């Protein structure tokens, strides 16, 4: 996170506006501008654990990772700089949360790439902080307004759910496949055998659908789930609870907070970080799996067929096999053997 994103570069064109401001940074924080911008004081709130990791090293306790921001997170701030995410319901959850805490009269800045739909911020905030576009550069828009009225915010109102077979899947804005099971996960699920036993880790668990479906027909599995996303962690916990299933669920940047070894690691790894295509998480998953699999343990992942994972699997484990595929997706399987690179 050394290079600035286009959105941050647009903000830097207005750096003089923030020198005497007490700024809260929030939203899709994909670089370390919150730690580097010259302000009277800076705080940050993020729902993404990997963003928190980067900023925490430079900002300490003034950056917080959680699903919902609290009053202490915006303490004494008079300015919000909000990075618009690609997901509009996610933006609504976060902005209603933050604006319900900031004092009336606060300066509100919203910045984002045009293709992310940042223009819809004007309509979303019209009742609370009418926005004007103050800059357009680097294919981004920067909007400014003042908070005229605090919205009421009820996090419970943002929960959704859908049914998969006999399972109830709980979801929140920002969680992958919020509106139903995606095709890739469906293909991976079709390969999971009933009566699986042992310790299973679901990396990038989303709403917890893979782990819940596995446990529903393999009651002897011991589940561990992790994700970088606070909404995903909370949704997975709620999914397990709704179906009477047990499991350990926590935030982790791939394996950063994972301890121990497992008999199976399953994942539908992301390859989009915000609007950018990123293979880093999936490559870290494959390479790091050797340190978290028992001998004979299995890594099973689903991915878009065009992604270059076979090479990484072969470099790391010595081999791989494709156990299911469609025109768009493949399910890869490999085993922890002595030839795997530890």
Curated annotation (Swiss-Prot):
> Which keywords accompany this UniProt record?
Cytoplasm, Methyltransferase, rRNA processing, S-adenosyl-L-methionine, Transferase
Q: Which reaction does it catalyse?
A: guanosine(1207) in 16S rRNA + S-adenosyl-L-methionine = N(2)-methylguanosine(1207) in 16S rRNA + S-adenosyl-L-homocysteine + H(+)
Q: Name one GO molecular function term.
A: 16S rRNA (guanine(1207)-N(2))-methyltransferase activity
Chief place of localization: cytoplasm
Subcellular localization is given as:
Cytoplasm
Q: Which domain of life is it from?
A: Bacteria
Q: Which GO terms describe its cellular component?
A: cytoplasm
EC supergroup of this enzyme: transferase
The UniProt record lists the EC number as 2.1.1.172
> Which InterPro entries does the record cross-reference, listed alphabetically?
DNA_methylase_N6_adenine_CS, Mtase_sm_N, rRNA_ssu_MeTfrase_C, RsmC/RlmG, SAM-dependent_MTases_sf, Small_mtfrase_dom
Quote the PANTHER family the UniProt record gives. Answer: RIBOSOMAL RNA SMALL SUBUNIT METHYLTRANSFERASE C
Q: Which family does it belong to?
A: Belongs to the methyltransferase superfamily. RsmC family.
Q: What does this protein do?
A: Specifically methylates the guanine in position 1207 of 16S rRNA in the 30S particle.
What does the subunit comment say? Monomer.
**What NCBIfam families does this protein map onto?**
PRK09489.1
What is the name of this protein? Answer: Ribosomal RNA small subunit methyltransferase C
This protein's species is Klebsiella pneumoniae subsp. pneumoniae (strain ATCC 700721 / MGH 78578)
Q: What is this organism's lineage?
A: Bacteria, Pseudomonadati, Pseudomonadota, Gammaproteobacteria, Enterobacterales
Which gene holds the coding sequence for this protein? rsmC
């Amino acid at each position: 996170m050394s290079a600035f994103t286009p959105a941050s570069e647009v903000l830097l064109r207005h750096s003089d506006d923030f020198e005497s401001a007490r700024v809260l940074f929030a939203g899709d924080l994909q670089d370390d501008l919150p730690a580097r911008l010259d302000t009277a004081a800076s705080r940050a709130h993020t729902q993404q654990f990997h963003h928190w990791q980067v900023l925490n090293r430079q900002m300490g306790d003034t950056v917080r990772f959680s699903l919902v921001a609290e009053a202490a997170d915006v303490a004494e701030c008079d300015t919000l700089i909000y990075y618009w995410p690609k997901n509009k319901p996610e933006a609504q959850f976060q902005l209603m949360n933050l604006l319900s805490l900031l004092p009336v009269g606060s300066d509100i800045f919203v910045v984002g790439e045009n293709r992310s739909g940042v223009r819809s911020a004007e309509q979303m905030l019209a009742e609370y902080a009418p926005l004007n576009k103050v800059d357009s550069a680097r294919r981004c828009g920067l909007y400014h307004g003042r908070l005229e009225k605090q919205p009421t915010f009820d996090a419970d109102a943002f929960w959704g759910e859908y049914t998969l077979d006999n399972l109830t899947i709980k979801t929140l804005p920002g969680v992958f496949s919020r509106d139903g099971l995606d095709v890739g996960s469906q293909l991976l699920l079709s390969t999971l055998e009933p009566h699986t036993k042992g310790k299973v880790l679901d990396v990038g668990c989303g709403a917890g659908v893979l782990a819940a479906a596995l446990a529903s027909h393999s009651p002897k599995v011991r589940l561990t789930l992790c994700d970088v996303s606070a909404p995903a962690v909370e949704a997975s916990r709620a999914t397990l609870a709704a179906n009477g299933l047990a499991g350990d669920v926590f935030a982790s940047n791939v394996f950063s907070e994972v301890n121990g070894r497992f008999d199976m690691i399953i994942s539908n790894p992301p390859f989009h970080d915000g609007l950018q295509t990123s293979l880093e998480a999936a490559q870290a998953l494959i390479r790091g799996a050797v340190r978290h699999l028992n001998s004979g343990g299995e890594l099973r992942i689903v991915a878009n067929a065009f992604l270059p994972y076979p090479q990484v699997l072969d470099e790391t484990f010595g081999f791989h096999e494709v156990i299911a595929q469609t025109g768009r997706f493949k399910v890869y399987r490999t085993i922890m053997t002595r030839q795997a690179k530890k």
